[in-house]
From Swiss-Prot:
Cofactor(s) required for function per UniProt: Mg(2+)
Enzyme class: isomerase
Source organism (scientific name): Camptotheca acuminata (Happy tree)
Name of the gene encoding the protein in the UniProt record: IPI1
GO MF annotations, alphabetized: isopentenyl-diphosphate delta-isomerase activity; metal ion binding
Record key words, sorted: Chlorophyll biosynthesis, Isomerase, Isoprene biosynthesis, Magnesium, Metal-binding, Photosynthesis
Positions annotated as active site in the UniProt record: 89, 151
Residues given in the record as Mg(2+) binding sites: 42, 54, 149, 151
Family: Belongs to the IPP isomerase type 1 family.
Lineage per the UniProt record: Eukaryota, Viridiplantae, Streptophyta, Embryophyta, Tracheophyta
Pathway connected to this protein: Isoprenoid biosynthesis; dimethylallyl diphosphate biosynthesis; dimethylallyl diphosphate from isopentenyl diphosphate: step 1/1; Porphyrin-containing compound metabolism; chlorophyll biosynthesis
InterPro entries listed in its UniProt record: IsopentenylPP_isomerase_typ1 (IPR011876), NUDIX_hydrolase-like_dom_sf (IPR015797), NUDIX_hydrolase_dom (IPR000086)
Protein name, entry field: Isopentenyl-diphosphate Delta-isomerase I
Length: 235
């Protein structure tokens, strides 16, 4: 288990998820090699000593005006509390429906599940077949001295008008942004204004892919941008 003093201050909901959720362990080629608790997968000590790498997904949901839905992670999140990030970021779990690698179906099933859990978006608002996997990235990012991320992340894009009812255990705030509004958020984060922080995985996607992919979102040509054969190592 972890450090008792540190864990004692952990939010009860987050603590339960840390030990109940089983993440999918993969190698750097995205082959499944086992599973471990969410707790162990986010301990920097384990990440560094055992090179634990787990599968993840990041949803980028746009409305019909092609504005991107962002969320601010709740203050009780163990990793990266109160940072702004893309619509939803989480992990497929080690269960049959979320282990399916073909057409990224496992990640898409997990995305539908977590959009309901975090943002209250009903499954019928985000049909699994409407998620378009555009790519995969591999990255490592410490959150603080104890916690961090080491993920092979599926980037899932979807254009839908949805009903949003955020879960306060997961989400502190939400907003839709245009390209220009996102660029202003980036400027503020870089300048340290208003205490604004962005998640490291979101920033990697923004810096490497997002704005060119946004063109495809608006043109309805996302399939042309998709590259699920490559794994972009952004470490």
């Amino acid at each position: 288990m972890g450090d008792a003093a540190t864990d004692a201050g952990m939010d009860a909901v987050q603590k339960r998820l840390m030990f109940e959720d089983k993440c999918i362990l993969v190698d750097e080629n995205d082959n499944v090699v086992g599973h471990d608790t969410k707790y162990n997968c986010h301990l920097m000590e384990k990440i560094e000593s055992e090179n634990l790498l787990h599968r993840a997904f990041s949803v980028f949901l746009f409305n019909s005006k092609y504005e991107l839905l962002l969320q601010q992670r709740s203050a009780t999140k163990v990793t990266f509390p109160l940072v702004w990030t893309n619509t939803c970021c989480s992990h497929p779990l080690y269960r049959e429906s979320e282990l399916i690698k073909e057409n990224a179906l496992g990640a898409r099933n997990a995305a539908q599940r977590k959009l309901l859990d975090e943002l209250g978006i009903p499954a019928e608002d985000v049909p699994v077949d409407q998620f378009i996997p555009l790519g995969r990235i591999l990255y490592k990012a410490p959150s603080d001295g104890k916690w961090g991320e080491h993920e092979l992340d599926y980037l899932l894009f979807i254009v839908r008008d949805v009903n949003v009812n955020p879960n306060p255990d997961e989400v502190a705030d939400i907003k839709y942004v245009t390209r220009d509004q996102l660029k202003e958020l980036l400027r503020k984060a870089d300048a340290g204004e208003e205490g604004l922080k962005l998640s490291p995985w979101f920033r990697l996607v923004v810096d490497n892919f997002l704005f060119k992919w946004w063109d495809h979102v608006e043109k309805g040509t996302m399939h042309e941008a998709a590259d699920m054969k490559s794994i972009h190592k952004l470490i």
